[in-house]
Structures are given as structure tokens and as C-alpha cells.
């Protein structure tokens, strides 16, 4: 059992616009395709000018590898630092972040640590947060109230110095979906008795078990999960030595890592260098956005009724903020983004790492629509 140290309070400068009632995590907001800016106007998603040259896309600075991200009902965000276990409250008005607590006992070797977060679908009643993290023994999922004790929900997920996965999301069915990695041993992804290289479906009210929880298999490193407007589950797969993938995730299907066959499911998108290193995904209406660590950009395209890419793959924020990790759309259609420039690979700026909130993300555009 992991203990938690309560450390923080609240911001004096941010007033929530309640009352709020949390709803199960479900379809994303519908965001209209961006319009071309008028002459002299700023393009959507580009850094806007702030007071005395400040960048109003940036809502938090001075963080350390923020990877977990969950949006609270009051419009603020919980941000989890991969290599410290700190959970911060970040405010959309760029008030100073507040340190709320620390998850101890992390193993941050390689890409391990605090890797993903999700709010309980009944957060207004139980105040629970779920986290995917690496310990000395395994990767596991825990649940806790802010300032409380972390209790294991699902343990025994294989760990490694690389490819630890960490994606978490609640589906419209109330189940918790978790993306795992192959831990650097690709053959494990095809082993139906091993939890590595899989997407898991976990009944948080039942008795979670081992292989019975496998939803999909044949993945390298599932770094992000996101939902379409109809509740369809999508995931990103970070792959060494091959294009990264965006997949439509279908129960009991195999996704071809490390060896594709006639029965494996093809990705809907493949991202080659230099735009690869996928870290996050989000859907708005008929369009999908995926962030890139190595590529230092956000890719976006429109999907058709069969979830195939129907428009040109475009990009924004290219090299503007460095390595981009987690994505979430809030109720106002703004896109929250975390940077990972202090992960030992990036070249951090003095104010890294940062959390961004893009008010008019250019997600959408040409291509076929979904009926």
C-alpha cells in the first residue's frame, strides 16, 4: 500500500464557475473546424501575445516531466509529474500551480514513474483519482482521494526500463481502460497470458484479474487513449524502428506488434520521423489530434465514418514548445497540452516544463465527415 503526503492548498486568484456536476468520461466536445484568420489576425494555435510579451498559451511553468493530466469539474487540472510523483493543481488563468500531494514509492528508471491519471466517473461522489505508476515490483493502477492513501486497483503489469505504457481512460461503459507497453521485449505483446503490450479493460467494481482483462494485444507502447464522439476507443502506439501508430481499438483484436499477419488490424494513421514519438491523443467531432515528443508538434486530421483518415495530415505548434506529451480537450473546447522537455532527452528552456491551454486549437478541416 502506498502512502501519500498532503502538501498543498488552493489558489487565491482563481474562482471556479460552479456549481459543477461530474459526468462519466465520455465523448469529447464538438469543436468546429478552424476558420482561416483574417488579415492581421493570429492563426489558431499559434502563441498569442500576452502582457509584456508573455505567452498566454502557457498556464503553468517550472514543472518536471508532467505526464498525468486530468481535468477537474471546476475547470482546473490535476497534473502529475512522472519523475517526482507530485500532483499539482493547475489553473486556466495561469495562477501559480499548487502542490497538492506526492505519490511515493515510484521507480523512475528509464521511462517509468507516474505515467497516467484519470478521474473516477463518479468523482462528485467519491472524489477518487486513478493513476498508472511504476513501482519497484511492477506497473500498477492505484486509486486515491486527494490527500488520502493510494490503494491498489490492478497490480502485476510487467515493467521495464522502457515501454511501460501508462495510458488511462474511463470508457462510456464505466470500465477503466489502461494501455501497457512491451517493456522492451516485443514478443510479450503477442503472448495472451502476459499483460505487456496490451490494452486492458478493468472492472473497478468487480474483481480485476490477469489475462481475462486483456482487451487488445499486439502493441509496442500504448502512451495515450482517447474517445470519439460515439464512445469509440482510440490509442497511440509508440514503436521503435517503425512508424508510430494511431489505432481504432476493437475488443479481442490483435494489432500486429512485433509481427503483422493476415488477421491483425491496420492503423488508421502512421507517423514517421521526424514527426514521431507519439505521446497523446484527443478527438474533437470528426477530427483527431496526436502529440509528438520527438516530432515536437501536434498532428491533426479529419476522420470519415469508418474512422479512416479523410483529410490531409496537418500540424501545429511545430518546435514551438519542444516535446509535447499529454493532450486533453476541456468543456470549452480548449486543448490542454503538457511538455516533457526535462525527460533527459529534450533541451529544456528555463521555464520548462510547461502546461499549455490552447483556446482555439486548429483541430478540424477538410476531408469527409461522419454521418
Where are these regions (language model features)?
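C-terminal amphipathic alpha-helical segment
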Residues: 242-245, 266-283
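C-terminal motif of bacterial Sec signal peptides marking the signal peptidase cleavage site
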Residues: 6-9
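Short, charged low-complexity linker/loop segments at the C-terminal edge of domains
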Residues: 15, 207-208, 254-255, 361-369
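Acidic, Gly/Ser/Thr-rich repeat motifs that build Ca2+-stabilized beta-propeller blades
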Residues: 11-184, 232-238, 275-306, 313-317, ...
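Sec-dependent N-terminal signal peptides
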Residues: 1-2
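Short edge-strand/loop segments of extracellular domains
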Residues: 136, 233, 240-244, 248-254
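Surface-exposed loop and turn segments in beta-propeller and other repeat-based domains
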Residues: 98-110, 150-164, 195, 200-220, ...
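Repeat-solenoid scaffold signature
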Residues: 214-241
Amino acid at each position: 500500500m502506498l502512502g501519500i503526503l498532503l502538501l498543498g492548498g488552493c489558489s487565491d486568484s482563481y474562482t471556479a464557475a460552479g456549481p459543477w456536476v461530474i459526468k462519466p468520461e465520455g465523448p469529447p466536445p464538438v469543436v468546429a473546424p478552424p476558420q482561416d484568420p483574417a488579415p492581421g489576425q493570429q492563426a489558431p494555435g499559434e502563441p498569442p501575445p500576452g502582457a509584456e510579451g508573455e505567452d498566454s498559451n502557457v498556464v503553468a511553468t517550472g514543472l518536471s516531466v508532467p505526464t498525468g493530466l486530468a481535468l477537474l469539474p471546476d475547470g482546473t487540472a490535476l497534473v502529475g509529474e512522472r519523475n517526482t510523483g507530485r500532483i499539482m493543481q493547475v489553473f486556466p488563468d495561469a495562477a501559480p500551480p499548487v502542490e497538492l500531494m506526492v505519490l511515493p514509492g515510484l521507480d523512475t528508471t528509464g521511462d517509468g514513474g507516474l505515467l497516467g491519471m484519470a478521474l473516477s466517473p463518479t468523482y462528485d461522489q467519491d472524489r477518487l483519482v486513478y493513476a498508472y505508476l511504476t513501482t519497484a515490483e511492477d506497473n500498477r493502477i492505484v486509486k486515491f482521494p486527494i490527500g488520502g492513501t493510494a490503494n491498489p486497483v490492478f497490480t502485476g503489469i510487467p515493467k521495464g526500463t522502457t515501454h511501460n505504457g501508462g495510458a488511462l481512460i474511463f470508457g462510456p461503459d464505466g470500465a477503466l481502460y489502461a494501455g501497457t507497453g512491451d517493456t522492451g521485449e516485443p514478443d510479450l505483446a503477442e503472448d495472451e497470458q502476459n499483460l505487456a503490450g496490451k490494452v486492458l479493460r478493468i472492472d473497478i467494481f468487480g474483481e480485476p484479474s490477469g489475462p481475462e482483462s486483456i482487451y487488445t494485444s499486439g502493441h509496442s507502447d500504448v502512451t495515450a487513449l482517447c474517445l470519439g464522439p460515439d464512445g469509440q476507443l482510440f490509442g497511440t502506439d509508440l514503436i521503435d524502428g517503425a512508424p508510430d501508430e494511431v489505432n481504432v481499438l476493437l475488443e479481442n483484436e490483435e494489432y500486429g506488434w512485433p509481427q503483422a499477419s493476415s488477421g491483425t488490424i491496420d492503423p488508421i494513421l502512421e507517423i514517421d520521423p521526424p514527426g514521431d514519438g507519439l505521446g497523446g491523443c484527443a478527438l474533437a467531432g470528426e477530427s483527431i489530434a496526436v502529440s509528438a515528443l520527438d516530432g515536437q508538434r501536434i498532428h491533426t486530421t479529419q476522420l470519415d465514418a469508418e474512422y479512416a483518415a479523410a483529410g490531409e495530415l496537418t500540424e501545429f505548434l511545430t518546435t514551438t514548445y519542444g516535446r509535447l506529451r499529454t493532450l486533453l480537450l476541456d468543456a470549452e473546447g480548449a486543448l490542454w497540452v503538457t511538455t516533457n522537455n526535462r525527460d533527459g532527452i529534450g533541451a529544456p528552456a528555463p521555464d520548462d516544463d510547461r502546461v499549455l491551454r490552447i483556446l482555439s486549437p486548429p483541430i478540424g478541416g477538410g476531408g469527409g465527415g461522419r454521418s
